[in-house]
Curated annotation (Swiss-Prot):
Biological role: RNaseP catalyzes the removal of the 5'-leader sequence from pre-tRNA to produce the mature 5'-terminus. It can also cleave other RNA substrates such as 4.5S RNA. The protein component plays an auxiliary but essential role in vivo by binding to the 5'-leader sequence and broadening the substrate specificity of the ribozyme.
CC per GO annotation: ribonuclease P complex
Protein name in UniProt: Ribonuclease P protein component
Gene: rnpA
Organism annotation: Cyanothece sp. (strain PCC 7425 / ATCC 29141)
Lineage start: Bacteria, Bacillati, Cyanobacteriota, Cyanophyceae, Gomontiellales
Record-linked SUPFAM superfamilies: Ribosomal protein S5 domain 2-like
Domain of life according to the entry: Bacteria
PROSITE patterns given in the database record: RIBONUCLEASE_P
């Protein structure tokens, strides 16, 4: 499980990422990204970019029953993705909301394939640095 500050949990946050974010695709995963914004007014005279740079990235994983009818399979995939993300957290740009969408073809993937595809997607989105 990811630590609480790194989790994307509210429906409105997922909706914002889906509707306004950008999308990158691979054969087994899709990555949606959206830069997080606070209110238009900067707090205590702090610039907006500086404020966002302190906020950790928030990540959500979306996996539907189309991937597998069996919850055991879906949960295994989510556990693998969360383990990969825990290792990549220090290298992720702060201030972003990310949603990883798992495609039905991901059932036959193993950990290494998920790791490779996730690194590739995060690099293409320019959210992964120093890795």
């Amino acid at each position: 499980m990811l630590a609480k500050p790194y989790r994307l949990r509210k429906r409105q946050d997922f909706t914002a990422v889906y509707q306004q974010g950008k999308r990158w695709n691979s054969s087994h995963l899709a990555l949606r990204t959206y830069p997080r914004r606070r209110s238009a007014l900067a707090l205590d005279g702090v610039k907006q970019s500086a404020l966002n740079s302190r906020e950790p990235p928030r990540i959500g994983i979306s996996i539907s029953q189309k991937v597998s009818k069996r919850a055991v399979v879906r949960n295994r995939i989510k556990r693998q993705l969360r383990a990969i993300l825990r290792g990549l957290l220090p290298y992720l740009q702060p201030g972003w909301d990310l949603v990883i969408v798992v495609r039905p073809t991901a059932v036959e993937c193993d950990y290494q394939q998920f790791l490779q595809e996730l690194k590739q997607l995060l690099s293409e989105a320019e959210i992964l640095h120093g890795y």
